[in-house]
C-alpha cells in the first residue's frame, strides 16, 4: 500500500464522507486533506457537533477540496468545508487552501484554516479574505520525499508573525529536518514532524488542535468540558 493510500484511508475514516481525492491525487494535496480530517476528528472527540457544507450553505456528505490556494468566498467551484459547534460557543469553520489577511494587510496562503463562522460568512458576503484576528488556527502542511527545506519554515514564521499570535500557528510535516526543528523552536512556533498515519506524532498534532479548541470554548462557555 502506498503512502497516499494510507492518507486516503485515514482521512476517509475520520471524515465519514466521500472525498474528491483519489489514489491519483498528489501526495501534498492529500496530506492537506489528512490534516483537515485530523481537525474534524479532534473536534468530534472533544464533543463537538460537526457537519459539512458546500459554497452555498447546503449540507453535504460529498467533499470537494482545493488543490491550490484560493479565496474563501470563491464561487468558481463548489468547494466544501466543515462546521464545528461546541455547545454555546461561537461556531467555527474549517477550510483547506484559502488566503488569510494578516495584521499587516498582506494576504497569506493557509493550508488548513480554522476560523469563526461569522467571519467566514462575512467573507462570503463581502468577498474579502478572513482577518487574522478572527482565525483560531492556521496549519502549515508539508509533504516531502526526504526532508523539509528550511525556507518553508521561514516562510511560515512570517505568516505566524503576521497572524498576531503564534499560539494560532502549527507547522506539520511528514518528514523531519534538524534545521527546521531548531528554527521553529527559536521562533517558538508549534510543530510536529514525521506526522504520518500510525506515527506517535499524530497524537501530538491532535493535542495541539485540542488546545486551540479549549481556548476558543473557554472564552465563551467556561462550563463546557472538552
Feature-to-residue mapping (PLM):
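N-terminal hydrophobic or amphipathic helices/low-complexity stretches enriched
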Residues: 1-15
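Nuclease catalytic cores
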Residues: 24-77
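Conserved catalytic cores of phosphodiester-cleaving nucleases, focusing on short active-site segments
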Residues: 39, 110-125, 132-148, 156
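Catalytic core of pol beta-like nucleotidyltransferases
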Residues: 52-57, 95, 150-151, 158
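Extracellular-facing segments of soluble proteins and assemblies that are Gly/Ser/Thr-biased and enriched
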Residues: 62-71, 105, 113-120, 134
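A recognition module on extended beta-rich or small alphabeta surfaces enriched in W/G with H and D/E
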Residues: 73-103, 107-113
Amino acid at each position: 500500500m502506498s503512502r497516499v493510500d494510507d492518507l486516503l484511508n485515514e482521512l476517509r475514516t475520520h471524515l465519514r464522507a466521500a472525498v474528491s481525492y483519489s489514489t491519483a491525487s498528489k501526495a501534498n494535496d492529500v496530506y492537506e486533506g489528512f490534516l483537515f480530517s485530523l481537525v474534524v476528528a479532534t473536534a468530534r472527540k472533544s464533543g463537538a457537533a460537526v457537519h459539512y457544507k458546500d459554497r452555498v450553505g447546503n449540507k453535504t456528505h460529498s467533499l470537494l477540496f482545493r488543490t491550490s490556494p484560493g479565496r474563501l468566498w470563491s464561487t468558481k467551484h463548489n468547494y466544501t468545508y466543515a462546521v464545528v459547534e461546541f455547545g454555546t460557543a461561537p461556531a467555527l469553520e474549517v477550510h483547506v487552501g484559502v488566503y488569510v489577511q494578516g495584521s499587516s494587510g498582506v494576504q497569506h496562503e493557509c493550508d488548513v484554516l480554522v476560523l469563526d463562522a461569522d467571519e467566514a460568512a462575512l467573507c462570503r458576503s463581502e468577498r474579502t479574505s478572513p482577518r487574522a484576528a478572527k482565525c483560531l488556527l492556521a496549519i502549515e502542511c508539508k509533504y516531502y520525499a526526504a526532508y523539509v527545506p528550511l525556507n518553508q519554515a521561514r516562510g511560515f514564521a512570517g505568516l505566524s508573525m503576521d497572524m498576531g499570535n503564534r499560539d494560532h500557528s502549527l507547522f506539520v510535516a511528514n518528514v523531519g529536518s534538524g534545521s527546521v526543528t531548531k528554527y521553529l523552536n527559536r521562533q517558538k512556533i508549534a510543530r510536529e514532524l514525521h506526522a504520518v498515519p500510525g506515527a506517535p506524532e499524530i497524537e501530538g498534532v491532535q493535542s495541539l488542535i485540542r488546545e486551540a479548541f479549549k481556548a476558543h470554548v473557554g472564552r465563551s462557555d467556561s462550563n463546557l468540558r472538552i
